[in-house]
Amino acid sequence: MEGSTVRSDLIKKGPDRAPHRALLKATGVTDADMGKPFIGIANSYIDIVPGHVHLKEFGDLVKEAVREAGGVPFIFNTIGVDDGIAMGHIGMRYSLPSRELIADAVETVIEAHQLDALICIPNCDKITPGMLMAAMRVNIPTIFISGGPMAAGRLKDGRRADLITIFEGVGAHSRGMISDEELKELEDLACPSCGSCSGMFTANSMNCLCEALGLALPGNGTALARSAEREALARAAARRIVEMALAGGPRPRDIVTPEAIDNAFALDIAMGGSTNTVLHTLAVATEAGIAYPLERINALSARVPYLCKVSPATAEVHIEDVHAAGGVMAILKELSRKEGTLHPHCLTVTGKTIGELWAEAENRNREVIRPVEDPYAETGGLAILFGNLAPDGAALKVGAVDPSITTFTGRAICFDSQDEALQGIFGGRVQPGHVVVIRYEGPKGGPGMPEMLAPTSAIVGMGLGKEVALITDGRFSGGTRGICLGHISPEAAEGGPIALVRDGDVITIDIPGRRLTLEVPADELERRRAAWVKPAPKVRKGWLGRYAALVTSANTGAVLRTPEE
């Protein structure tokens, strides 16, 4: 211990730390271990989440590898929520708030025990961003190694399927378009194994973005769960984190800069990633002390082409195909051939720059990862729309909108909750030409900003995906497709313009112009605003009550702030 200068010396060095060492020895730590770096392993194993059900064994592998590399591993667990299982009922209100609990939990364990470095093992939707937020707070050497995606399902006729296929199947079944037996086949075959759901949904989007941010090793976002390659990545991450702990860096805030966030959004735009990545990456930026305006995303989208179309944008390509084609680094390498799209100098946990990493990659399938000369679209798969209906922005997954649709004008049909909207959709009230407005489902109003996968999937499954639009102050699943705008800010519960919309109002969605417009005169909107009454909070007690009182707007990542802030 004499030459040790690591952070954990605070809990293990000197005569006055004899009680601390005694407690550590009770866990199996030896005198020889006291001179080694203490490595926290934030796992997220939980039985009810298929993306996490295998993480106990995976975490043990990482723990063993850290010890082999010369570190002292301490594994701990966070909670996790499966958004698919929580979808469409009260449970979804707990999904986004779980991100804050995860961030707080990781911060608490790391700071309480003054650990030297951190390996994060996330996988699904809110776990990855929650751990990213914690990493920004504690700012000790950190590597992310996710649990990996599941393979796509295979139906009896050879077609591929995934979770979104089932959600859309529910809509088709409600219209008599598929039988009970066909729906049961989807249920049985679409999700064949453990791992994060197999499309470019929120979980895989965030795990891919970890690579682009520089916080994960190449392959993290795409190598399948339980594959030999995933295990090799875990061992490599363990070796590297011990090196970083001894060197004292690089640290997360050295890596996550505005330029690194640009790179992450550029990847997201090139892949048509989930709109949730906007919410989560803004939250990570906020925790890192970075002001990142939404307009910067639109500037990127204007010059970043859409190169890699993955489910739900196409039924034919899943994350496993992206991995076989070369993965995230191959996409970045292809994108780097267009000047002004990426920042190659950004640092990564490997010690190399991101440009050095993508230089080693190869695009092995130009049908899966298009060359920049032949993109799916010259501009990207993600956009932020502004206008009198969304003064602080609304997020749109352009890559999941039919390419034939560039503008949509329709009449509003308003619902003050997701449940009301589902009743209206399945009850036949929603017709071609409608813009479905689902409000009071934002961070405060929900509370918890629930995802709207059930209504969007029902609309698509019923064959209305090109004829009906949906806008909301809530969120969407990464699997949502169609003309769907979420994260409308300010939200209805805060008196945002979405609260003033009435049935029959004309709404125009202009995708190329990045405008969302309520075609109602300003003086009429002022009259409506004067008559508007702020509703009482839906929840006043417990975690959701505290969350609703402290959460900020979607345009700043829906992070929590104490009242004095």
Swiss-Prot record:
PROSITE patterns: ILVD_EDD_1 (PS00886), ILVD_EDD_2 (PS00887). [2Fe-2S] cluster binds at C124, C197. Coiled coil: none annotated. Mg(2+) binds at D83, D125, K126, E451. GO terms for biological process: isoleucine biosynthetic process; L-valine biosynthetic process. It catalyses: (2R)-2,3-dihydroxy-3-methylbutanoate = 3-methyl-2-oxobutanoate + H2O; (2R,3R)-2,3-dihydroxy-3-methylpentanoate = (S)-3-methyl-2-oxopentanoate + H2O. One of its GO terms (cellular component) is cytosol. The active site is at S477 (proton acceptor). The keyword Transcription regulation does not apply. Its cofactor is [2Fe-2S] cluster; Mg(2+). Its EC number is 4.2.1.9. Keywords: 2Fe-2S, Amino-acid biosynthesis, Branched-chain amino acid biosynthesis, Iron, Iron-sulfur, Lyase, Magnesium, Metal-binding. Functions in the biosynthesis of branched-chain amino acids. Catalyzes the dehydration of (2R,3R)-2,3-dihydroxy-3-methylpentanoate (2,3-dihydroxy-3-methylvalerate) into 2-oxo-3-methylpentanoate (2-oxo-3-methylvalerate) and of (2R)-2,3-dihydroxy-3-methylbutanoate (2,3-dihydroxyisovalerate) into 2-oxo-3-methylbutanoate (2-oxoisovalerate), the penultimate precursor to L-isoleucine and L-valine, respectively. HAMAP family: IlvD. NCBIfam families: ilvD, PRK00911.1. Belongs to the IlvD/Edd family. Homodimer. This is Dihydroxy-acid dehydratase. It comes from Symbiobacterium thermophilum (strain DSM 24528 / JCM 14929 / IAM 14863 / T).
